[in-house]
């Protein structure tokens, strides 16, 4: 079985996230995609973070494909960092082929993640195109550090079975939706407190 692991704050989840998930399922030939809603992101301000239960509920609404399984694995495992979550998932599922799925907009800061090199050395990574990231991804530290491990996207269907480090950049339809922009719109609509 091949499973994509797609983690994020999803604050809020939106059609752009669903598009990334659908592209990953189709292009990577995944049996399932685990949409992993994190309790929080150590690199982001948590003051605007909706509750985990709310983000899970909204993710369930956005993720319509039955192959997408919305989870709160980090909360269940009581871990904070992706590297720890992925190690626990792999240990609990030794017969599953996993691939880490991320939107290209996250690639610029991937080198700031706790033990990011460990993630890249232990999991194949699929980077899905996002607006404004198509060309800039090449200058990211991850792309430069692991340039010899990049696969042409035509090999995306076999990525999950490749020995890491291995990664690919997948082009395709892009959504301009952004959680940050959606939160700003919500703040403008919210009644002011006087």
Swiss-Prot record:
InterPro entries membership: Cyt_trans-like, NadD/NMNAT, Rossmann-like_a/b/a_fold
Family recorded in the similarity comment: Belongs to the NadD family.
Gene designation per UniProt: nadD
UniProt-recorded name of the protein: Probable nicotinate-nucleotide adenylyltransferase
Role played: Catalyzes the reversible adenylation of nicotinate mononucleotide (NaMN) to nicotinic acid adenine dinucleotide (NaAD).
Keyword Hydrolase attached: no
Keywords of this entry: ATP-binding, NAD, Nucleotide-binding, Nucleotidyltransferase, Pyridine nucleotide biosynthesis, Transferase
EC number(s) stated in the UniProt entry for this protein: 2.7.7.18
Provenance organism: Brucella suis biovar 1 (strain 1330)
Coiled coil stretches, renumbered: none
SUPFAM superfamilies, per the entry: Nucleotidylyl transferase
One GO process term, biological-process aspect: NAD biosynthetic process
Phosphoprotein is among the record's keywords: no
Upper taxonomic lineage: Bacteria, Pseudomonadati, Pseudomonadota, Alphaproteobacteria, Hyphomicrobiales
Substrates-to-products reaction catalysed: nicotinate beta-D-ribonucleotide + ATP + H(+) = deamido-NAD(+) + diphosphate
Pathway stated in the Swiss-Prot or TrEMBL entry: Cofactor biosynthesis; NAD(+) biosynthesis; deamido-NAD(+) from nicotinate D-ribonucleotide: step 1/1
A GO molecular function held by the record: nicotinate-nucleotide adenylyltransferase activity
